[in-house]
Structures are given as C-alpha cells and as structure tokens.
UniProtKB/Swiss-Prot annotation:
Binding site for GTP: 59-62
SUPFAM superfamilies in alphabetical order: P-loop containing nucleoside triphosphate hydrolases
NCBIfam families, A to Z: PRK05416.1
UniProt protein name: Nucleotide-binding protein ABSDF2931
Alphabetized GO MF terms: ATP binding; GTP binding
Amino acid sequence: MKRILIVTGQSGSGKSSALQVLEDLGYYCIDNLPLALLPEIVAKLDHENNLEQLALGVDVRSTRADMQEFDHVFEQLQKHGTVDVIYLTTQDQDLIARFSASRRPHPLANRFKSLLQCIHEEKQLLIPIQFCATVHIDTTDKSVHDLKHILLSKLGQSDNLIVILQSFGYKHGIPLDADYVFDVRHLPNPHWDLELRRFSGLDEPVKQFLEASPQANEMFEDILHFLKKWLPAFAEGHRHYMTISIGCTGGQHRSVYMVDRLKQALEAEWSVQVLHREMKHWS
C-alpha cells in the first residue's frame, strides 16, 4: 500500500466531505472506525487487496483511552505505507452555525451540555491526534469546492511546490492553516473612499488607487523578495504546498489586491493557487 490517510478533526468541520473528495480521487475510504481496530483492518486490507490509496475516517466517538494510544496506532500503520494525518478544524461560531443548519446533534451531546461545551470538550479529546497531524486544514468559511481545491493542492503527488495565496479579513479571524501571514492593514484603505468601497482588489479602480501608494508598492516588493528567496528552499525540503495568507481589515480590497499582484509575479515560476476567503462578504 503506497499511501494511507487518516482524516479526522472536529465534528462538523467537513470530515465526511473530505472523504467524498478523496473517494473521487481514487482512495478506498472507510469511515467511523474505532481507533483500536485500525492496525488490524489495514493489515488485512494490505494483505488481501491490491490497494494503493486508503483513507480512514476517525472521530471523537473512539474511547478516550484509544485517543491516548494514537501515536502507537500511527506507528503500526506506518508498516503498511506512507501515513498522513489530515486534521480539520473550524472556528467555534462556524461549527455552531453548521450544527444549527443541519439540526444534527453533536456526537458528545447530552441534555446536560451546551453545544459550545461539546465543541470545547471534543477539542481536548482530539489533542493526541492533532499532535500527530501532518496536514492541518481550517475549513472556516470554506465550501466543499474550496475543500476539494485545498486537498488537491496539499496532497499533490508531484514534487513541485504549490503556492497557495490566500486573502482574508482580520475581523473574520486569522486562517489557522497559514504557513506565513502578512498584515497589510497599514496600507491606504479604499473602503473609506465611497466610490471605491463597492469594488474589490480585483477591480481596476482599486488597483489604480493602491498602485499610487508608495507604501503598497514597497510592501509588495518586500513580500515578493521574501517569497522568491525562500520558496526554492521550501521546495528542496520536499514540501508539496505552502500557504501564504495576506490580511487586511475586511478581506475585500488591500489583501485581495496584494494576492492578485503576487500571483501575477510568481506564476511564471511556480504553480500558484488563489483563495479569496472573504469573497462571500464582499459588498
């Protein structure tokens, strides 16, 4: 077996959706297996089936004792192939909204606990698995399409480094899956120009406004210089992806402009993917 993926994380963060994406990519997927049974089942599948890619869904319904033994389970699985642990997380307010929309109970729910208490308890239970995770994905404000896009990037089979450029708004929270975060809130803000407010950083009026700013141009050059200097080193370290997040206040103007400009400067040398996290909030 060439590759084994363990997909886990907070309930409601998109584990089932991630497994569906992986199934479409050719992975043999099994969900909701008790942790203690994983080594035995993987050994059986490896012996009796000609599987190259296996994805296993694990959640908090495993016992607390099983969770504490996860590092041992991880070592056992490594006998059968390369193992990656994908850990999905989502901000509390997004999880609450998802459970409210689906009307499904949290796995730890009972009549003595609030939903927020269940979320916080689950985080503590999952710490042993989170510690072993090799891939972290924050699914806050991300659609299933976005999740597929991120999984494709982070699980790329080639040795080519994929650069993910992500714009975001600080008022919606810092992305938890970022490798580097650049803050551009000090740049002139088009939001305060009523004629520019309705546009985004992809629109020409906002581009012209920011290109006229010496600060914006200097910030762009500094970030670009950093990336051009260090991306080759990251690639030599056999990383498949690097997530660079750039934030402004709302995630509509300055960060979007900077991401778009960096994409144009880097795409001739690197495989570049772009995510504008706050697009649904744009006015």
